[in-house]
Amino acid sequence: MSEQNSVVNAEKGDGEISSNVETASSVNPSVKPQNAIKEEAKETNGEDQKCKGPENAGSTAETKETSNDATNGMKTPEETEDTNDKRHDDEGEDGDEDEDEDEDEDEDNGDEDDEDVDSSSSETSSEDGEDSESVSGESTESSSGEDEESDESDGNTSNSSSGDESGSEEEEEEEEEEEEEENAGEPAIAHQDSVPTNDSTAPRSTHTRNISLSSNGSNTNSTIILVKTTLETILNDKDIKKNSNAQKAIERTLQKFKEFDPQTTNNPHYVDSILVFEALRASCRTKSSKVQSLALDCLSKLFSFRSLDETLLVNPPDSLASNDQRQDAADGITPPPKQKIIDAAIDTISDCFQGEGTDDRVELQIVRALSSCILEEDSSSLCHGASLLKAIRTIYNVFVFSLNPSNQGIAQATLTQIISSVYDKIDLKQSTSSAVSLSTKNHQQQSAIELSEASENAETPAPLTLENMDKLNDDEERLMDAQQPDSIAITNQDLAVKDAFLVFRVMAKICAKPLETELDMRSHAVRSKLLSLHIIYSIIKDHIDVFLSHNIFLPGKERVCFIDSIRQYLRLVLSRNAASPLAPVFEVTLEIMWLLIANLRADFVKEIPVFLTEIYFPISELTTSTSQQKRYFLSVIQRICNDPRTLVEFYLNYDCNPGMPNVMEITVDYLTRLALTRVEITQTQRSYYDEQISKSLSTYNFSQLPLLTSSNLSSSPDVGQVNLLFPLDFALKMVSLNCIVSVLRSLSSWAHKALNPNTHTANKVLLNTTSSARQESRSSLSNDVRSSIMTSNDDFKPTYEDEESRSLSSQNIDADDPTQFENLKLRKTALSECIAIFNNKPKKAIPVLIKKGFLKDDSPISIAKWLLETEGLDMAAVGDYLGEGDDKNIAIMHAFVDEFDFTGMSIVDALRSFLQSFRLPGEGQKIDRFMLKFAERFVDQNPGVFSKADTAYVLSYSLIMLNTDLHSSQIKNKMSLQEFLENNEGIDNGRDLPRDFLEGLFNEIANNEIKLISEQHQAMLSGDTNLVQQQQSAFNFFNSRDLTREAYNQVSKEISSKTELVFKNLNKNKGGPDVYYAASHVEHVKSIFETLWMSFLAALTPPFKDYDDIDTTNKCLEGLKISIKIASTFRINDARTSFVGALVQFCNLQNLEEIKVKNVNAMVILLEVALSEGNYLEGSWKDILLVVSQMERLQLISKGIDRDTVPDVAQARVANPRVSYESSRSNNTSFFDVWGKKATPTELAQEKHHNQTLSPEISKFISSSELVVLMDNIFTKSSELSGNAIVDFIKALTAVSLEEIESSENASTPRMFSLQKMVDVCYYNMDRIKLEWTPLWAVMGKAFNKIATNSNLAVVFFAIDSLRQLSMRFLDIEELSGFEFQHDFLKPFEYTVQNSGNTEVQEMIIECFRNFILTKSESIKSGWKPILESLQYTARSSTESIVLKTQLLVSNDIVTNHFENVFSQEDAFSELVGVFREITKNKRFQKLSLHALESLRKMTQNVADICFYNENKTEEERKHNDALLRGKDIFQDVWFPMLFCFNDTIMTAEDLEVRSRALNYMFDALVAYGGKFNDDFWEKICKKLLFPIFGVLSKHWEVNQFNSHDDLSVWLSTTLIQALRNLIALFTHYFESLNRMLDGFLGLLVSCICQENDTIARIGRSCLQQLILQNVSKFNEYHWNQIGDVFDKLFDLTTANELFDYDPLQQGRKSSVSHHQTTNDTSQHSDDDSNDRRENDSNISETVERAHQEESSEDVGGDMVETLNGQTKLNNGNSVPTVKDELNPKPASLSIPKKTKHMKRNESNEDIRRRINIKNSIVVKCVLQLLMIELLNELFENEDFAHCIPYKEAIRITRLLEKSYEFSRDFNEDYGLRTRLVEARVVDKIPNLLKQETSAAAVLLDIMFQLYLNDDEKKADLITRLITICIQVVEGYVSLDDRTMERSINAWRSVIVEILQGYYEFDDEDFRLYCPAMYALVIQILDKSVPTELRHAIKQFLSRVGELYLSTD
């Protein structure tokens, strides 16, 4: 309850100070607070003032005086000179002041000038004899002639960084430093007050002794009466008698007043100001409180009424010099320096305060009088600089040392009012105008601080630290003061700015005073610190415009910006107080920090992260820090989190800056850690926490200055910080959770405001300005922005708009290019990864660093610099890496050491600095290498210190050992000084180092260990709890010490030490002004969220699961909602998926019994997110819709529906629990299993889950109308989704619908909620454009495909019916030509028909089509195609009813009624034909097939009517037909599909009648309409339709398409024969169109002929003959050439070359006729004939001899085939045995038994296959060659052919025949070859080609004789060949033996007959020429048997011989 009392006291105190302030400023708060003080003085003194009348008159006079008697704002030259005398007066005053204030003052400080305003100068209390908090720092500066000396007495001038000195030691050092500065006579900022530094003579003034401030009569009289009454009262006081000087001065003044008689006309018109002042000053110097009070009261009123001339100069007190203003030093006497009356009055009034012993009434009058001197409306007030500061000091001292709480309050209020008035005097507009003019001179002005730092950095860095910050501030003051020229025009604005600076500096110095560890809150030091901190807070808060303006400068040579001038002091304030354990101090310091963050972060861009990361975050994580500190800091963090611009700019300027800490990331991680803390809390504790949420955490109300009087403060610093009634961690957890949500809310706010920005004009200008222009115009631009904002906003709360203005007003703002920052962040992250690699394995990191550009190369210098300059490296890893012994690492180590500068350092300091950069390894060799290089570097930079480097090396090593020995806890016996001396004997080149030197080293190491400060700091932070535990023991049970506080104080010092190092590094390399990036782009939010979203997710998830209260869970849900919104907006898919997944988990829909209200709220949030962010959810829609499905299930269950009938989709996704549970249960139903087997954990879990029920309360929530409406809106508002989003939505919805169906696949009433919604969504989105519907239906179509083919018919019928309804709606929408949306949405019907074998489904779809056609036929466009494609599938059905319905629908409905509709659609006609084609090919229903063919035939007529011109058609009909044909190629698009339908039926239909009718219909159509076809179309018909009919023949020698010989026989007897004949007939009919494709026809016939099947071959031969003979008269030369080529090809293909190729000896073919024989042999002389005859006789004898041996040989072309029982004449398959026949013998009719007789048992299958293939090939080719010979014979027997064939082609044919004859003759003559073929088992018997030889010879001779007879011109060429062949044949015949070669003789006899008949028909001449040779042979023929035919031929020949020769004889 003490905390609550504290709050009440604080509120009461606030009220008191408020009332006091109100009283003090009741007339005019900003101008006349002295009236209020005057009334307070009356009450305090208890006296009746006698000046009531003059006081009232003075009030009137004051008003008039303000308007009429105000002096000019600018000082006259005389006034400026008048101010030069006050320095010496101040010095004199100080001496008196020292005597009067405290007789026992400590003289160590010399003079009170050396003390600061801060109370800590006297906090040791009066018993020590020190000054009682006289705020003298600033006033004594002026008193010593320096106006504004450097006052920071809290800086530590020592160079030591240990920070171990006590507060008193620091004060003594600071005071000594200030004393030295003042004795040195530094100019400080005296020039800014126009007070000369060393002037000893006051300049002459134009004022006279007797001239005073003139006024009207009434004012003058009132003033005289006031003064006279006061002086008379004083004179009557008994105490005045003790001071003769005062008494005399009063008497002189009264005497002077007596000269003016109010009753006479001698009315005064002026008051002698000096005379009056001297009297009152003398009165104030008395020791009488009453006299002082009266004098001070009079002075207060005089200055309040401005009755005295403040510009007059007066002598110091007790001076004997004249006050004549015109006196000069001509008489040789130097007068003492003079002061202005205002300055002298302030000195006099201030001297009246004597510390704690001062009378209360005097204290009050002092405050009143000082406020009267300072607070005035006139902006030209002369109270500036030192006087102002002295007045402030005095009032401050009254507040601190007064024993009267009321006086303390009044002093505090007055002080606040005075300071506020100082800042109110700064004219921002004037500053702006002056700044604009200055900017034209030099736009690159920098502050003196920056210039000084830059100049110092050029030589040796002067780092900013906490311990030497005071000294740095003093140095800066000197630098700024030195820039002030002696003669510069000081304006009132300059004075106002300088006063503001001085006041701020004074307050900062007071704040910086350290406090003792144990202090009373009512002590002077604490109250002083609190007041100064609150004043600084008020200054910044109430006058933030002054700090924001970069156009307010301190006057000087280099005009320093105001914010830069106070920067170091503000740093000092924060760094000295940020870690204070006192709650009020900590709070106000943190509030100041917040002001910097909220308003000045652009100016303190480098300081803010230092304080946050080095002080506040470490403190907040200390276990010893107070709960108030943690909670209050977290509350400030929450403010940051609530400010979008601050967050974004933190990220840009810190997290994306490689040289800055990741402030944003650190903050979020800190909040996440707190949010993840597991805290158990009772309901009672929670209620306590809820109660205090609305209460303020702060000790004081910061909206106004708190009353800090001693009576209003408690003595204990912990009052008000009572023990919390709830866990601290819980409070932190809840606030951190709020912070996380606030961050998200701010990011979302920034993103959406930026998406629709009302961008500030200045922002646009700024972002559009180039870099150079931005630098030039930065000052003026930022000032204009600030001015415009300030005029429109009176308050400066951190609103969004104000924040933007403030950020823009920074000096160094640059454009925030999102890409630039993204790259910076990526590079920073990459560097962090490289550092992590280095800390783990240093050597692996170097190549990575080079690759990523962090190192330019692997040179030692580059690596060494990187190791020194990079933060975050593990010092141990650096030491190990540098200490490696290989050459590369040693070189890097040397380069590393060479980077250090040890110049001027002692060896210990150098070693200490050196060892701060790495941890020294433990190995001696590594240490040795380090020390060797260190010694070399040290000696090089410090020559003369040691004689050689060895000395430094040994000494360094010795110091390392000493440091380890003295400070290691493991070493008990420490090294003594003597041992250390002995260790270092003779190391300096054989000599000892000086003993004093070594002793100093020893002592320094002993007192200050060399250690890594960073590791020490971290160890201290992590071990703060251990400090408390170490200090506690059993013996201090009764100890009253606060060990936790002591531990915290110890750690806080370490924090300060670390912060000092950070500031040191912060300013080390500063080369110019910092660039601050103001946020303006929405893309920054994306980068931030991508970086931090995992932390957000981690922070929001556990609290929701851990707590059930609405507030906490709603916060988590809000955070998730915003996160999803951000992730969706910026397409951060991983984040969006994760957050949606978390929200889905929060719904907890899988566990019915565990659903709570928070889960229902999660459902609501999820639905709201879906509605608001639907356009960006993409893949997350599925999770959401799955939840919707589960919610609908819960709603059904809540209504009483059995849960088993509504399966859970989510459970079915993993496994069907119900099925698995029931199956497991059913599997264990045996009798013994009931008791013998226990359920497994899985089964128990399934049973428990199955038995869950929904609570009534949750059922009510689940079924609420709000939830139902939200669920419905998900679908009804889908029409508002974008085109891409609706596709994502439908994808998800279809996926969920499929899962629903799968989960209830076997149910009688399957779950189809999502399926129904999918249909509904289609209706809702029916108005979408086709562009959006196309991808939409692509998804839905696939879903319907799956659903409509489901095994559950209920699902299928629902899907089909839904499709039907949707299709009816879609068909109502007009579809333009060229679009195919109807095709798309009707496609699922086709898929369903194709993949569903259910008859009912197919019938239902056919009925749907019928419905479409009957009702929407006119609207159907592209939809015809899927309808007809579907009907094609139904046409293939094996169910007659399906095929029948298809046939009726197509024939009766479509073709009859809607043929033209179909015909007009692209591709639809071909699909219509395809339906008929499929029906014709359906082998089960011949009748339907024939009906379909009939329909096709009729449709052919319809198509012909449409396509071809008919003279009987009207013009309208022609136009109608043209419209139908528009866009169509009548041949390609119309006729070809029709003809192809017939063709396909011909090729594939199984029914013979169908095939035959199709063939007839096709050729009928071709014959009927072929005349309309063009040549190109005919070519296509032939190649695509006609020739493919015979495609089975494309491979020569085999027909393997048919499964059986019966199939082949049927095909041959029907289709092939009929088709070939029709084809030839068609060719003949349309010869003109088809003749150019003769090659194709001939090639087709060649394929027919070259088949093993004898039937096919003979059909082909017959058709070829028919083709040639029917068109013989139409062929041209080209055609005959093609025919010749065909015969060439046929003879070549049918030549059995295998007979020679497979000779085992490979001897090849041997010619049986000598090649030397020429055509002229027959015409040679008889000698040659006789020689030839002899040769022939010998050949004949050989032939006869061989013939006897081969009589039993087998004729391949005749006998072999004939042995097959006439198979070649049948149409029943292969004519020769196959491999299969050989391996698996069949009946004799299908195989050759002789083959297997000679087969070897060990012959492999491969050999058998090869042998049979060879034999088959030989037989087939020989047979076919005989057919070709026969064909030629028949052709030449035709007179037309013989007449039409060109001679060239006829000769070509004779060559073929001659070649065949010679081939067979050569083979027959090579008896050895034939024998070898038998031995090689190529054939079974010795083969011969007798039939081929005789047939070829016969046909050849016949053709040649015809040619001879028909062509007289060519006889000469022909006769020679003819005679040669005839002679050869006859000679061969004659040589045959009648007894042994009867078969050969019989074979050749017909040839001999033909030869003789031919000879008979020779011309007489030719007969005469060639008959002699033949005559001899004929005579030999008679030796043989001569049958009748031969006898008749011989008779004719001999008769012709007789006629020729006998007649001549």
Curated annotation (Swiss-Prot):
Protein name: ADP-ribosylation factor guanine nucleotide-exchange factor SEC7
Entry note about domains: The highly charged acidic domain may serve a structural role to interact with lipids or proteins on the cytoplasmic surface of the Golgi apparatus.
Cross-link (Glycyl lysine isopeptide (Lys-Gly) (interchain with G-Cter in ubiquitin)): 797
Purpose: Guanine exchange factor that acts as an activator of ARF1 at the trans-Golgi network and is thus involved in vesicular budding and traffic between compartments of the Golgi apparatus. Activation of Arf (ADP-ribosylation factor) GTPases is essential for vesicle formation via recruitment of cargo adapters and coat proteins necessary for Golgi trafficking. Also plays an essential role in ER-to-Golgi traffic. SEC7 also acts as an effector of two Rab GTPases, YPT1 and YPT31/32.
Compositional bias ranges of the Acidic residues kind: 91-118, 144-154, 166-184
Renumbered residue ranges of the record's region Disordered: 1-220, 771-814, 1708-1803
Taxonomic source organism: Saccharomyces cerevisiae (strain ATCC 204508 / S288c) (Baker's yeast)
Subcellular localization: Cytoplasm; Golgi apparatus; Golgi apparatus, trans-Golgi network; Cytoplasmic vesicle, COPI-coated vesicle membrane
Gene name for this UniProt entry: SEC7
